[in-house]
């Protein structure tokens, strides 16, 4: 059975609204009752071709809590450095008995090269494409607070052009009934979207302030200067004055890693409205739910 005949999680578009809500409720159930399935007969390989702390480690912890045998693929010591293709690497893992892959890669839609694989893939982030499990943990965190998405006003603020998080979250949130606006400097805007606002124009109206990391590694050198950082924080960062204009029950989110003093004042990272570290905690529970879903749907 080829890849696209399997149930994968490559894009948030792979899930219906019902499936998204079921995953949220299952993740909350695992969080509250510690009742995850146990499967010690399956092997999962984690292939991270880009740096990661939260996504990679939460997948590893989630896999261990499910009893899965977690394999850490070391790019630096693999045959990738001898010129082996991504397909050949993944096909090798399939042939030696790996049952599932979690992949992060700098290439957008890298999975299109893997259509002849016969094991399912969970996308851990594809360049500036999508990040479906980050999206799901964000949705879980919002749902825990508001119990619904319908009519919520959400601002996604920052490096829209380079953000896979922005793209996945916009798709899912609008599909679920939320009203999403973008806030960004002109050079960080993505022409795919047209619903841009000024931060100060909507700061007192939004329920969710979703900040994005300025992805310095994807930018030109002038975007890394202290002058740029100061201007960015002044115009598009969550400063204390802006924070004080938020609605009483609003929440502040960030997929992390956080550039303190750039996207958000360092004193606000663990403020009352911030759920940044809760997002990280929820990520492990959501990834358990996703792993369960992939196992069940593919009869592994």
From Swiss-Prot:
Residues annotated to bind L-aspartate: 82, 164, 213
GO term, biological process aspect, one: amino acid metabolic process
Family to which this protein belongs: Belongs to the aspartate/ornithine carbamoyltransferase superfamily. ATCase family.
Enzyme class: transferase
Species of provenance: Malacoplasma penetrans (strain HF-2)
Pathway membership: Pyrimidine metabolism; UMP biosynthesis via de novo pathway; (S)-dihydroorotate from bicarbonate: step 2/3
Stated name of the protein: Aspartate carbamoyltransferase catalytic subunit
UniProt function note: Catalyzes the condensation of carbamoyl phosphate and aspartate to form carbamoyl aspartate and inorganic phosphate, the committed step in the de novo pyrimidine nucleotide biosynthesis pathway.
Pfam family, one: OTCace
EC number(s) reported in the record: 2.1.3.2
Binding locations of carbamoyl phosphate: 54-55, 104, 131, 134, 256-257
Catalytic activity entry: carbamoyl phosphate + L-aspartate = N-carbamoyl-L-aspartate + phosphate + H(+)
MF (Gene Ontology): amino acid binding; aspartate carbamoyltransferase activity
